[in-house]
Curated annotation (Swiss-Prot):
Gene3D superfamilies: Nucleoside Triphosphate Pyrophosphohydrolase. Belongs to the Nudix hydrolase family. RppH subfamily. Accelerates the degradation of transcripts by removing pyrophosphate from the 5'-end of triphosphorylated RNA, leading to a more labile monophosphorylated state that can stimulate subsequent ribonuclease cleavage. SUPFAM superfamilies: Nudix. GO terms for biological process: nucleoside phosphate metabolic process; ribose phosphate metabolic process. A motif (Nudix box) lies at residues 47-68. Its cofactor is a divalent metal cation. It is an enzyme of class 3 (hydrolase). This is RNA pyrophosphohydrolase. Its EC number is 3.6.1.-. Keywords: Hydrolase. Residues 8-160 form the Nudix hydrolase domain. PROSITE patterns: NUDIX.
Length: 168
């Protein structure tokens, strides 16, 4: 059995989708192994990078698969890959015990569509499994308090890097 410390990180992307008012999209997760309490169930879209896929293409794909959104303009990306470890108590259940956490490339995207484009209940016209049960626009500076605690340092860095793009 592989020791927790020796497990690799899952390569992923994260998306800060910013609307014309400078607010950021967050989705309410339906629960699962990361669930801590009802105050920490909100997150920005994120997901894995497929083999042979570059991070930018993965970001657009994941955003569509989770929200149905295609109307975006790329504003920025964080140069570094940001990492977080999942708690040891759930490491064996998350991703079938193959990873200790995620290494994420983060993108800031301007949402150029209308709210009617967003569909978290039947993303991609129902082709993709719903990851969120609801969504809202939120001031960027609030995001670290809404995420599960073990992802908080990543969200703090994302806010620091992208705050000016949201006008805050």
């Amino acid at each position: 059995m592989t020791r927790y410390e020796d497990l690799p990180y899952r390569t992923c992307v994260g998306i800060a989708l910013i609307n014309s008012e400078g607010l950021v999209f967050i989705g309410r997760r339906a629960g699962g192994i990361e669930h801590v309490d009802d105050a920490h169930v909100w997150q920005m879209p994120q997901g894995g990078v497929d083999p042979g896929e570059d991070a930018w293409e993965a970001a657009k794909r994941e955003l569509y698969e989770e929200t149905s959104v295609r109307s975006v303009e790329k504003l920025a990306e964080i140069d570094d890959w940001l990492t977080y470890d999942i708690p040891r108590t759930v490491a064996g259940r998350a991703w079938k015990g193959r990873y200790r956490g995620q290494r994420q490339k983060w993108f800031a995207l301007r949402f150029t569509g209308t709210d009617t484009e967003i569909d978290v209940e039947r993303p991609g016209g129902g082709v993709h499994k719903a990851e969120f049960i609801s969504w809202r626009w939120e001031p960027m500076q609030n995001l670290p308090t809404l995420i599960v605690p073990f992802k908080r340092p990543v969200y703090e860095r994302v806010v620091k890097e992208f705050a000016a793009l949201a006008g805050k």
